[in-house]
Each structure stands twice: as C-alpha cells, then as structure tokens.
A protein has these predicted regions:
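A structural-propensity feature for long, helix-poor, extended segments
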Residues: 221-233
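Conserved small/polar residues in nucleotide/adenosyl-binding loops
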Residues: 253-260
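Small-residue-rich helix-loop
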Residues: 208-217
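Conserved mixed alpha/beta catalytic, RNA-binding, or beta-rich assembly cores of soluble enzyme
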Residues: 179-185, 189-193, 197-201
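A surface-exposed, charged beta-strand/loop segment in the N-terminal or early-internal portion
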Residues: 33, 39-42, 47-120
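Accessory, usually C-terminal, subdomains that scaffold auxiliary metal cofactors
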Residues: 211, 232-252
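Internal, conserved structured core segments that host functional sites
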Residues: 99-173, 179
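N-terminal, Lys/Arg-enriched amphipathic/low-complexity engagement segments
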Residues: 1-32
C-alpha cells in the first residue's frame, strides 16, 4: 500500500493491483481511494509493506491525527502525536505542574469511582452478575483511593465477566488478554490524542508516574473507559470469533468501535 497526499486528501493506492494484468479493469479502478485528512482521528499502520510519504505524516499531525504502528502480530508498538496541539499549551502545562496534592488525589478518587461504576454497568449488562458490592465500593472510594478499592473491584470484576477457565487479567496471559491488550492500546492512543489537542502534557500523570512512560496522564484518563473495551471483547467472544489470534476481522471490529471515541 502506498499512502500519499493530493489536494489535502489522503490517497491510498495499491500499486501491485494496478500492475497486475490478470485483474479486470473494474477491479483496478478501485485500487485507489481518497479520504479527507480532516476527517481522520487515528491511523493504524498494520502491514510491513506500507509506504507513507512525509507529506502525509505532516498533514495528519497538523490535523491532530494519532498515527499508530503495529508489529508482525498486529499489536500497536508505536504512537506519533503532534508536538503542538493547542494555542494555550504553555498555560495548561503550568496549571498541571502547579496542581496541589489534594487536588491530584481528588482527581484520582473521581477517576477510580467512575471506573468501578462503569465496570459494574458492564458486568451487569454482559454477565448479568450482582453488582451491589461494586456500587458500594464506588461510593466508598476515598481521596487518592487510599483503601485501594480499585484493586478489590477489579478482582471481583474479572472473576465474573468472562468466566473462562484459567483466565486472569494479565498482559501476557491466555486469550482474550490479547484482545484486551489491543483494545487498550488503541484507547490509549485516542486518549493521548485528546490530551494533546487540549493542550495538556500527557507525560505528567495524576497517579501513574513511571519515569519511562511518556503517556502517564493518558493511562490515568483512560481508566474509566477500559470497561468499554471489555464490553467489545465480550461481544466478540459471544459472536464466536477466534480469539487465539488477533485477526484482521477482530482488529477491524475494535477500530470501528473506537471511531466514536476518536471524534470526541
């Protein structure tokens, strides 16, 4: 696939299709597609045979589009975002740096509370499980989540959501952990894109503080939205799709579902 820029439009071209004399002309005419750059929120590059011009990269970043690159297993491994996404960026940076510890703890309290509430909603909708305990935990979250109710809720949530023998939520664990990893990676990119567009520094988190993590704030803000990915994965399993490998069909399902998020 060759990606280029023409009249502020992304041109997606399949050179091998054009060169193939055995294919009908009608099929060849469909070998080139154009998409408005301004309508794109996230672009996922998931093939080693993709060629992309610097003009396309520049146009995508100028329009605040997140660019994700994937490895041979279709897992996102790289993320490119614009350096300047907001005219008041410097002011926003200073506000982040000057945030008091009580404010930071209150923000994390709100984040954890919403995450548990969303987990409860997904668990009740998908698995029909009793969620009264999760509702209580959400209401009892203190400033900074000093009682670590996030972990308690997560243990109950994962035990009752998929009900797959031997399943625990582990990045390196058995399927559907692979589908969850993929969905979270796309969600993380969408959130990071939104933070940059808002003039915020994605590196400076309110809870995550890994010195090697360039997207600590994105990891914080995405927490309440993780159950959205969990519900998508649950539906994929219910439809009988093979979750042992991250197929193009499964990836497409995730990406289509995240289009709404990318427009936020």
């Amino acid at each position: 696939v060759y990606l280029s820029l023409r009249n502020a439009q992304l041109v997606i071209k399949l050179p091998e299709v054009v060169k193939n004399d055995t294919l009908p002309d009608g099929f060849k005419q469909q070998s080139e597609v154009t998409k408005p750059i301004e309508d794109l929120g996230v672009v996922v590059l998931d093939n080693k045979q993709i060629t992309i011009t610097s003009g396309v990269l520049e146009a995508l970043l100028e329009n605040n589009c997140a660019i994700i690159t994937c490895d041979s297993k279709s897992m996102p491994v790289g993320l490119m975002l614009p350096l300047y996404g907001n005219t008041t960026q410097n002011e926003r940076f200073r506000q982040q740096l000057d945030a008091s510890l009580p404010l930071i703890k209150q923000l994390w309290q709100q984040t954890v509370r919403m995450k548990i509430e969303n987990q409860a909603a997904v668990l009740k909708k998908c698995a029909g499980e009793e969620v009264k305990c999760m509702t209580i935990w959400a209401a009892d979250v203190k400033s900074g989540d000093s009682d670590n109710l996030e972990a308690r809720a997560a243990a109950y949530y994962w035990k009752n959501l998929f009900k797959i023998k031997g399943f625990t939520r582990d990045r390196e664990g058995i399927p559907p952990n692979n589908l969850l990893n993929y969905g979270y990676a796309i969600l993380r990119a969408v959130v990071a894109r939104g933070l940059v567009a808002s003039g915020l520094l994605p590196t400076l988190g309110i809870h995550h503080h890994n010195r090697y993590n360039a997207y600590c704030l994105a990891d914080d803000i995405m927490e309440p939205y993780r159950p959205y990915v969990d519900e998508l994965v649950y539906k994929i399993l219910q439809e009988g799709m093979n979750c042992n490998e991250l197929t193009k069909a499964v990836s497409y399902t995730h990406l289509r579902a995240h289009e709404t998020c990318a427009d936020l």
